[in-house]
Amino acid sequence: MDIEKLTLKVQQTINDSQKIAVKYNHQQLEPFHLFAALVFQEDGLIPNILGKMNINIKVLRDEIKRELNEMPKVLGDGAQNSGVYATRSFEEIFIRAESIAKDFKDSYISVEHIMLSLMQGRSTSIKKILDKFNIRKDKFLNVLQQVRGNQRVDTQDPEGTYEALVKYGRNLIEDAKKHKLDPVIGRDEEIRRIVRILSRRTKNNPVLIGDPGVGKTAIIEGLAERIVRGDVPEGLKNKIIFSLDMGALIAGAKFRGEFEERLKAVLKEVENSQGKIILFIDEIHNIVGAGKTEGSMDAGNLIKPMLARGELNCIGATTFDEYRKYIEKDKALERRFQPVIIDEPTVEDTISIIRGLKERFEIHHGIRIHDSAIVAAAKLSQRYITDRYLPDKAIDLIDEAGAMIRTEIDSLPTELDSIKRKIFQMEIEKEALAKEKDSRSKERLEDLEKELSNLKEKDKEMTAKYEKEKEQIINMRNLKQKLDEVKGQLEKAEREYDLNKVAELKYGIIPGIKSQIEEKEILIKENSQGNMLKEEVTENEISKIISHWTGIPVTKLIEGEKDKLLRLEDELKSRVIGQDEAVEAVSNAVLRARAGMKDPQKPIGSFIFLGPTGVGKTELAKTLCKNLFDSEENIIRIDMSEYMEKYSVSRLIGAPPGYVGYEEGGQLTEAVRRKPYSVILFDEIEKAHDDVFNIFLQILDDGRLTDNKGKTVDFKNCIIIMTSNIGSSYLLENKKEDGIDETVKNKVSNALKDRFKPEFLNRLDDIIMFKPLTNREITKIIDIFLQDIENRLKDRNITLIVTENAKELMAKEGYDAIYGARPLKRYIENILETKIAKQIIKGDIYEGCKIGVDIKGEEIIIGKI
């Protein structure tokens, strides 16, 4: 027996048969061990053929194990050391298999030859099992012919090439017949263009090119459904579309040439079908370089000749980037395909597409989807999710909203869950009190038992209601699933022209199920008041999902949030003292945005704050962020003093290709991509280079910016605040108490025009001037600083009391009109905080005491009260 003449699977079978003999303590290697190894082979050819002969493989394997246990065993120390010896009948199997292989005109002995040789052998154990399971040679040969086709065994791994399309592909026509594909709405023009290209004599290979998520694969599924319905030209009727799985084709190809062998087997099957099979390769760019190792060919070069001759009908699908990167590079491959551009559908088209899918989602999740939710999904996804494409992002929203409602149905309602937890806690308390003997414990036990019985009654009532509601929803889901299955049967009956079945389904079963669904829906609507479970996806759920994804508040305003927004101006004024004009402008911009009245193509607001240092420009941005997001973390702060050189623009949007830092992205673009709803603070903008302002033009006008990788970043949900000290010397001259003098305003405006270009200033929503602080405002600021100190001391249970005289001295000593409120803060830190800290460390001030702050002469003194 020449081992080189055996296929890899046969060599594996011999090894497996030896392992079986050792496992069962058999000293002789019999044909039965070989038979067992063939049947036990996972994903092997023999189990596949036997399965097609309608033989229960599990039962067959159990029978073989029983037979192996009954064979003579050799036990003891001697048996351990001695090997396993092949019998004469075992060797005869291979002699017979060699002659069978010659009859088949095969170059190698394969597993099917071994199986046929075993069938012809004299082993009584094998014959007994074959007879018991009715495994006959003629039947085996018929199924083998179906699996092998006209292929010959001329390689060492032929089993991997049998039924190659079934193994490495998916029959879309079969899926369409079984009602497994989602309905495809619209896209008629694209499908017609594909049909025209497929009907050509040569170069009949369309490649669908479009952005990810626009529905390229869905269009091919739509074509498969049309072929099933017969809604195609005569030339495409009865064609089969096979979707090739490149991953499965490459996976497990260990040796050089194995991948090419598999692909050749697939192509041979397509060629032998004489144009009946159309091959669909999703992500077709993967064929360029797929399976390529040193010295071997890639998949692209293997299919080129067949594409050129028109022997292979192939449809590809890829994105613009991948087409340019892989297919366009290979000009010979590119010219063999005809591009079909798939554009992103409009919002209206997306609504139609989702309406077509609505029923499938309702059946899967067992819920109902409102039409308003479908419209909201299309419109809101287009507006707020800018880095993905329709209809994919809108379908994802509907799917996730359905999943959210479904999980809420499956889990206990909050009210019922809290009652069950309370009962559990009371049961524990009851057990503890039962062990106590004092009168108070006995009284508490009596009260507890009454409360517990009331809660248990309530729990019983609510659980019954919950179970009833859940049962109604599950029944509705089952009815909808049944209706979907019956519709699939109707389509099949119409294709097969079974008129009796069509009449029975169309006029008997389907109307009956529909009337049951209507009855259930009426019942659910009637009892909807006070329902514990929600089984509808509405606009609100879609808004919630978008808010989770992006962080942008899209949900309808609830009462608490309305009050918070209406109070926003007062909240800002309480922290930013004396700058009412700036506070009003910013809070009004936020109100417009949340009410949906802002221009959807521009940022929420873009402002430039002008004024001397320390008057509250940066503080306003921080306070706004704290009020909107409950933290200052969502502020994106860019210090423009770091962008004084011309080349530093690249730090904002990312370095160009070939430069260090290209992969990292820009500081501004990456920050906004991660947090699309945020406050962006460009501090000290006059310090930046002139060229930096050129990138602001797109942000301020269209609310977008393209980064170094060509991706668009959306600024439409950002508040842009820029601060500058330009004209601060003029503002310090302002003598007007309740505002800014007109002459001062004109001087500041002229200074601004001298520094910035008109196209930049013209795009800003508002230029706000901050006036110097008055004495009254300084006192209020001191109160804010002291409140911060009080809050810190409160943690230690220490009370701080400051006299008015002390506050006046702080204002006099700490405030400087040129430097603003910052020196005042430093003064309070140095004089007040430092003195308190020293006394805490000494132990003079301790937890629970009161501190008084007063003056003595021109000095602030601190002491215990």
Curated annotation (Swiss-Prot):
GO cellular component, one term: cytoplasm
Residues the entry annotates as binding ATP 2: 611-618
SUPFAM superfamilies: Double Clp-N motif, P-loop containing nucleoside triphosphate hydrolases
Residues the record lists as binding ATP 1: 210-217
Region annotated NBD2, chain positions: 561-772
Residues forming coiled coils: 395-529
Residue ranges of every copy of the Clp R domain listed in the record: 3-150
Domain note: The Clp repeat (R) domain probably functions as a substrate-discriminating domain, recruiting aggregated proteins to the ClpB hexamer and/or stabilizing bound proteins. The NBD2 domain is responsible for oligomerization, whereas the NBD1 domain stabilizes the hexamer probably in an ATP-dependent manner. The movement of the coiled-coil domain is essential for ClpB ability to rescue proteins from an aggregated state, probably by pulling apart large aggregated proteins, which are bound between the coiled-coils motifs of adjacent ClpB subunits in the functional hexamer.
The protein, known as: Chaperone protein ClpB
Organism: Clostridium tetani (strain Massachusetts / E88)
